[in-house]
């Protein structure tokens, strides 16, 4: 495991969309181990459960209007993660971000593969490297 070098975090905000997983919190635990900033988006009725485990400053409550105004283009009852995704996008724009990271709540660890070798990632540097790569191009 490499432990030397400059550690960096992403420039763009990182959001985790979560529902009903306050007990497992895989992605937030992984990001905490990496000392990476993030916000987790939850519905209001689950706020207290998440707040027992996650710093309240990191928790964003999904405004009801995003659920009520969401058109899932289907006859199914649920909206899925669409409302939360739209909220994250608008939240990022309102806070001056030109891009943002949107993560599911079931990621146990982050890593990269080089020459057929899996390397466990221990900082946000990998996100920053991806941003640097993407920002070289105008159509990404």
What are these regions (language model features)?
Residues 1-36:
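N-proximal low-complexity "stem/linker" segments adjacent to membrane-targeting elements
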Residues 12, 98, 139-140:
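Conserved acidic residues
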Residues 23-26, 83, 125:
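Short, conserved clusters of charged catalytic residues that mark active-site
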Residues 29-30, 87-94, 129-133:
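A generic secondary-structure signal
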Residues 39-43:
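Short internal beta-strands
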Residues 44-103, 108-122:
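Active-site-proximal specificity loops/subdomain of glycosyltransferases
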Residues 110-140:
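Conserved catalytic core of nucleotide-sugar-dependent glycosyltransferases
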């Amino acid at each position: 495991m490499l432990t030397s070098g400059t550690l960096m975090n992403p420039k763009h905000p990182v959001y985790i969309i979560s529902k009903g997983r306050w007990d497992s919190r895989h992605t937030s635990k992984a990001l905490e181990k990496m000392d990476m900033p993030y916000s987790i988006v939850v519905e209001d009725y689950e706020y207290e459960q998440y707040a027992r485990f996650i710093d309240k400053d990191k928790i964003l409550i999904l405004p009801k209007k995003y659920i009520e105004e969401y058109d899932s283009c289907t006859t199914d009852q649920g909206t899925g993660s669409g409302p939360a995704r739209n909220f994250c996008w608008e939240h990022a724009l309102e806070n001056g971000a030109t891009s943002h990271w949107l993560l599911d709540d079931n990621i146990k660890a982050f890593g990269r593969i080089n020459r057929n070798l899996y390397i466990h990632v221990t900082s946000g540097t990998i996100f920053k490297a991806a941003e640097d790569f993407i920002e070289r191009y105008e159509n990404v």
